[in-house]
């Protein structure tokens, strides 16, 4: 079954899809932390697909990824609501770096679980933004499973990449 034919997946998709108002609100929150990123014509891509094609240069953000947008929209909502005083997440890189950046900006403690073989460059980026790192599991799924089972993380709110409407609304501001 695809998302279009599976009623459960379709319902989840519709629940996460931001409204125009949520996207505008997210854009306002994010604008305090991220400069606009340019779109550039990609001549090679144009040649290959036969039409004008532009790419968005999200790699110039401090996180070097569009994922900063979602994290920067989620974290202040959690902080203001008092929903969590400590966060945790599992990542192989970009999501962890984005959450680390946002949590640093909002002074919210974060623990990022990464697989033991995680890329050193990504690990350094996560660490540079001040998150506590835990090397757990051999892959992302195993890392998540360990974190969700380990009582050491029971006092944290676990953030799954892409599973929050605030994350999706933040990401929708890329346009």
Question: Residues of each region from the PLM?
Answer:
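PLP-dependent amino-acid enzyme catalytic core
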Residues: 2-175
């Amino acid at each position: 079954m695809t998302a279009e034919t599976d009623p459960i997946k379709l319902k989840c998709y519709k629940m996460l899809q931001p409204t125009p108002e949520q996207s505008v609100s997210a854009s306002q929150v994010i604008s305090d932390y991220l400069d606009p990123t340019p779109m550039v014509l990609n001549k090679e891509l144009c040649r290959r697909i036969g039409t004008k094609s532009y790419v968005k240069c999200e790699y110039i953000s401090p996180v070097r990824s569009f994922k900063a947008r979602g994290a920067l929209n989620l974290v202040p909502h959690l902080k203001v609501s008092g929903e969590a005083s400590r966060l945790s997440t599992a990542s192989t890189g970009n999501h962890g770096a984005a959450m680390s950046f946002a949590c640093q900006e909002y002074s919210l403690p974060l623990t990022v679980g990464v697989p033991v073989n995680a890329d050193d460059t990504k690990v350094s980026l996560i660490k540079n933004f001040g998150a506590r790192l835990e090397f757990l599991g051999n892959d992302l799924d195993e890392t998540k499973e360990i974190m969700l089972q380990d009582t050491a993380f029971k006092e944290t709110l676990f953030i799954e990449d892409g599973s929050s409407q605030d994350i999706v609304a933040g990401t929708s501001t890329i346009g």
